[in-house]
């Protein structure tokens, strides 16, 4: 403006600077004394600074209550009870977070320190952790194989009480298309033909087999020959009770043991008593 003071006449300066900018009427400017361009510019700036008042701050509508949530897959999980307040959206109207509009779901600019219920947070954390990775319902123990407790139809019929079996003799084979990525196969298939082998030795098992045979029932009865029965009847007719020397002699003659001879004499006396008792009952 100062450079234009020497060449521009006063009437053109009046037309260049509008009367409204000086805050005075047009009549006063036309009737007043003439000023140079430099003086008039200084006065205009001072008067404009006095008359301009600070612009009021733009008022914005009260922030509406928003809800917090997160997207997983094609579903949206809302957390309405969580204490989150919106203090002002700093981002633009089309701001987005992970492909979803920010102004629709949550305000990432500032969050208040409102306490959140512990049950709600723990429940949401567990749910998100479950849907995020889809883990197994339980973790397998390395080095052990699960065996069902229920007995099989083709088994021996006794229940298996061992729930875990050591797999020290097994090595993993990896497969690309399998779920777990590896299966266990025995190193040597001809180690033990019977998986459930008893720790007892062979002699002990043999003795137990003999004991079980005796427990099943009486030993098979061996009938006496006619020669043996004739010799026993002859000695019984002589004496119903046998002595030690006589028992040895009969055992040698009949090729029977002394115990067999003794038992035969006992049974013979019982049989005679029965016969005598029947005869007495028949006699009137």
Curated annotation (Swiss-Prot):
GO terms for cellular component: nucleus. InterPro entries: AP_axis_regulatory_Homeobox, HD, Homeobox_CS, Homeodomain-like_sf, HoxA13_N. Coiled coil: none annotated. One of its GO terms (molecular function) is DNA-binding transcription factor activity. It is found in: Nucleus. It holds the Pfam family Homeodomain. Residues 217-276 bind DNA. Keywords: Developmental protein, DNA-binding, Homeobox, Nucleus, Transcription, Transcription regulation. Gene3D superfamilies: Homeodomain-like. SUPFAM superfamilies: Homeodomain-like. GO terms for biological process: positive regulation of transcription by RNA polymerase II. PANTHER family: HOMEOBOX PROTEIN HOX-D13, SEGMENTATION PROTEIN FUSHI TARAZU-LIKE PROTEIN. Belongs to the Abd-B homeobox family. Sequence-specific transcription factor that binds gene promoters and activates their transcription. Part of a developmental regulatory system that provides cells with specific positional identities on the anterior-posterior axis. This is Homeobox protein Hox-D13. It comes from Heterodontus francisci. The gene is HOXD13.
């Amino acid at each position: 403006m100062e450079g234009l003071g020497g060449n521009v006449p006063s009437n053109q300066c009046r037309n260049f600077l509008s009367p409204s900018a000086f805050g005075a009427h047009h009549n006063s400017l036309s009737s007043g004394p003439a000023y140079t361009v430099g003086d008039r510019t200084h006065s205009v700036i001072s008067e404009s600074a006095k008359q301009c008042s600070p612009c009021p701050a733009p008022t914005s509508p009260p922030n509406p209550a928003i809800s917090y949530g997160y997207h997983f897959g094609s579903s949206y999980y809302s957390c309405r009870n969580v204490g989150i307040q919106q203090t002002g959206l700093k981002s633009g109207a089309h701001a987005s977070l992970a492909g979803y509009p920010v102004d629709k779901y949550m305000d990432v600019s500032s969050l208040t320190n409102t306490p959140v219920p512990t049950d709600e947070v723990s429940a949401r954390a567990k749910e998100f952790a479950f849907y995020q990775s889809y883990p197994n319902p339980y973790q397998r123990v390395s080095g052990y194989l699960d065996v069902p407790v229920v007995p099989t139809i083709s088994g021996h019929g006794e229940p298996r009480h061992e729930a875990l079996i050591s797999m020290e003799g097994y090595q993993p084979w990896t497969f690309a298309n399998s779920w777990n990525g590896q299966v266990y196969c025995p190193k040597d298939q001809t180690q033990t033909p019977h998986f459930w082998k008893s720790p007892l030795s062979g002699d002990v098992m043999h003795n137990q087999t003999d004991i079980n045979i005796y427990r099943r029932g009486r030993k098979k009865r061996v009938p006496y020959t006619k020669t043996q029965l004739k010799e026993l009847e002859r000695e019984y007719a002589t004496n119903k009770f046998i002595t030690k020397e006589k028992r040895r002699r009969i055992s040698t003659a009949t090729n029977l043991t002394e115990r067999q001879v003794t038992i035969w004499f006992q049974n013979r006396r019982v049989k005679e008593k029965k016969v005598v008792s029947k005869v007495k009952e028949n006699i009137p």
